């Protein structure tokens, strides 16, 4: 992907800017109102550009809205590709593939799981602070046994 080829990385950044600004300013489709382009990855041969997108505020939980947005992006794919070609000045414009970015939704779920774990840790710490032994502090020590603190009388003269 774009990580190994500096030219591919530059083109990916350009495609991200062009596609994001075009969705915001030129495409007047209500289905794309809350779309954000999160990343673009271009193959080293510059033939394919995967455009990762997400919907703000939805994190992928609204399946119907996500499908409608995907359809709108697929319909606008040709227009967006021509805009990229015009602004980039490339001999061959990469084919655009729109992929829903699952990372924000998964990150939200992970944050929820971590919050629950933190709450449980705090409850455990409070329980530990007030905990007492079920029996004696040292279950192996009995009151009827002599203590180990004996003095050695052999040194006295």
Swiss-Prot record:
InterPro entries assigned = KH_dom-like_a/b (IPR015946), RbfA (IPR000238), RbfA_dom_sf (IPR023799), Ribosome-bd_factorA_CS (IPR020053)
Q: Which GO terms describe its molecular function?
A: ribosomal small subunit binding
Query: What cystine pairs are annotated?
Result: none
Q: One Pfam family, please name it.
A: RBFA
Query: Which GO BP terms apply?
Result: maturation of SSU-rRNA
Q: Which GO terms describe its cellular component?
A: cytosol
Under HAMAP family, the record lists: RbfA
Note the subunit structure. Monomer. Binds 30S ribosomal subunits, but not 50S ribosomal subunits or 70S ribosomes.
- What is the role of the protein in this entry? One of several proteins that assist in the late maturation steps of the functional core of the 30S ribosomal subunit. Associates with free 30S ribosomal subunits (but not with 30S subunits that are part of 70S ribosomes or polysomes). Required for efficient processing of 16S rRNA. May interact with the 5'-terminal helix region of 16S rRNA.
Q: What is this protein called?
A: Ribosome-binding factor A
Q: Which organism is it from?
A: Bifidobacterium longum (strain NCC 2705)
Which gene carries the instructions for this protein?
A: rbfA
């Amino acid at each position: 992907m774009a990580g190994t080829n500096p030219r591919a990385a530059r083109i990916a950044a350009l495609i991200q800017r062009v596609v994001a600004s075009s969705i915001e300013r030129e495409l007047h489709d209500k289905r794309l109102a809350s779309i954000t382009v999160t990343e673009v990855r271009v193959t080293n041969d510059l033939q394919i550009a995967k455009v990762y997108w997400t919907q703000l505020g939805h994190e992928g939980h609204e399946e119907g809205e996500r499908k409608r947005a995907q359809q709108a992006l697929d319909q606008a794919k040709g227009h967006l590709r021509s805009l990229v070609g015009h602004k980039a000045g490339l001999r061959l414009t990469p084919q655009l593939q729109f992929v829903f970015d699952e990372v924000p939704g998964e990150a939200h779920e992970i944050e929820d799981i971590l919050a629950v774990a933190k709450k449980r840790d705090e409850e455990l710490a409070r329980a530990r602070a007030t905990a007492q032994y079920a029996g004696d502090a040292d279950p192996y020590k009995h009151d009827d046994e002599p203590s180990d603190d004996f003095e050695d009388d052999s040194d006295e003269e």
